A protein has these predicted regions:
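Short N-terminal binding/cap micro-motifs at the start of the first secondary-structure element
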Residues: 10-16
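Short, surface-exposed basic-aromatic patches at helix termini and helix-loop junctions that form
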Residues: 21
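Extended, alpha-helix-rich binding/interface surfaces that flank or overlap catalytic cores
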Residues: 1-2, 16-18, 28-188
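Structural motif
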Residues: 4-9
Length: 195
């Protein structure tokens, strides 16, 4: 896995390198000027995820000065499916004062809703830049260990065919219907699978 980080992300670069070492990961972290986004995650020469990192103050400022609309427009034109473009929003809205901008917490909530619902981007909230760095590394760890390398919207994605009896837990009694009860009962017998 390769993590490409924009050269302007000085603190994040230091944290990623430190945590990469502390956790015993061996991800290739490179620093370069990214035309779009702040972090790009690659595997074997293919870009998997593009992440746009924003503190609440950054988000508020970008709404005020128009960068938010321009940036989301450019992200929408990226070759990755919007679901694989992730806004990482750092901070606690409950303690956001917005004293440096005219943006109120309610506007931040509706903007985050818009990012997901109307624009189709993914969004993750983190407490601070340290949690952001850990999140990025944990995502890379999961992707590197996963047998399914392709995300849902990737052209090579093949969904696994499972029937209900393969995924139901015995305690989910309210999910039992006359149509699936036979498979569920049989799958409870040792040595018998639902296949």
């Amino acid at each position: 896995m390769q993590i490409k980080v924009d050269i302007r992300e000085h603190t994040l670069i230091k944290l990623l390198n430190a945590l990469n070492n502390d956790y015993g990961f061996n991800f290739d972290i490179s620093v370069e000027r990214l035309d779009l986004g702040d972090i790009s995650i690659w595997n074997e020469g293919e870009e998997l995820l593009l992440l746009e990192r924003k503190s609440l103050n950054d988000l508020a400022s970008s709404i005020t000065d128009g960068r938010y609309a321009e940036q989301s427009y450019r992200l929408n034109g990226h070759s990755l499916h919007n679901h694989n473009i992730v806004y990482l929003i750092e901070g606690n809205i409950s303690t956001f004062s917005g004293k440096w901008s005219k943006i109120k917490p309610g506007t931040l909530y509706t903007t985050m809703f818009s990012i997901q619902y109307f624009k189709g981007f993914s969004m993750i909230r983190t407490f601070d830049i340290t949690e952001t760095a850990e999140y990025i590394l944990r995502v890379c760890d999961k992707l590197s260990r996963s047998s399914e390398k392709f995300g849902f919207y990737h052209e090579s994605f093949q969904p696994k065919k499972k029937n209900y009896a393969q995924v139901v837990h015995a305690e989910k009694k309210k999910n039992i219907t006359p149509e699936n009860i036979g498979g569920i009962i049989l799958s409870q017998i040792p040595g018998i699978s639902s296949k």
